[in-house]
Amino acid sequence: RRMEEGIYDHEEYAKAMAWTEKYCKPNEGEDFKNRPEKRKTREEKDADWEFIVKMTIIMRDLMVGNPKLLEMGFKEEAIGHNAIAAGFQGQRQWTDWKPNGDFSEALLNTTFDWNGIREAYVLATENDACNGVAMLFGHLLSGCGQMFSDIRTYWSPEAVKRVTGKELTGMAKNGIIHLINSGATTLDATGESHNEAGEPCMKPNWEMTEADVEACLKATTWYPADRDYFRGGGFSSNFLSKGGMPVTMMRLNLVKGLGPVLQLAEGWTVDIDPEIHQVLNMRTDPT
């Protein structure tokens, strides 16, 4: 309804599109996942960009409200839900028909957007409430944006050698967990921000700089969504995180007969041979 009836700040939308045209569309990736007959035309992709920018504004307005909507005569919509966290369920009722939520989720989970540097929102992919709670814990404890990603694969040293002919070294020598398949991951997780020692890191919003913002955007490619999964299209974020960042993975599970159980795993991001990364990245879906 908000989309169809234009219930969003049209001035902000114009500002957001100008920002997206400058920082995101130039990094649109090649449409290599879709068969030629499934690829959208340039005009259709441009329309998708416009749609997902509006989606982002509307999702934020639903969470926290927007006084501009009151000026437009939409008193109830202007209030929002005073949400500390939210989620978006797309598959398949939405994504079979409309562009997916990856861009909106990635950007809202990030510490900046077209309005500048700000606190990251907490928005769970596929309305995964348990993961949303874990993301909220992480955000409130650290002040940082939270990385939502699939634990797709554990790659043992032997498996990496078998499929690539190369060996993992350094901190990766005992094997790696490949976090992939989430085009909704916060751009802060690129690791393009650096601390005072020059080490890659994820910063709380009050430590972010304009240089950090531009570096995170530059490191992110927006690939057209795989239309075998997302018939409605959209764009998904893709990047390779810098190695050397300490990270904590969290997951809240509901165990029958026990209740909520929080899993924690501490580790590090690692740099690996680019040729190894290319092979592993293409084993599932880079988008």
Please report, for each region that a protein language model flagged, where it lies by residue.
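Terminal amphipathic helices with adjacent charged low-complexity linkers/tails
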Residues: 1-12
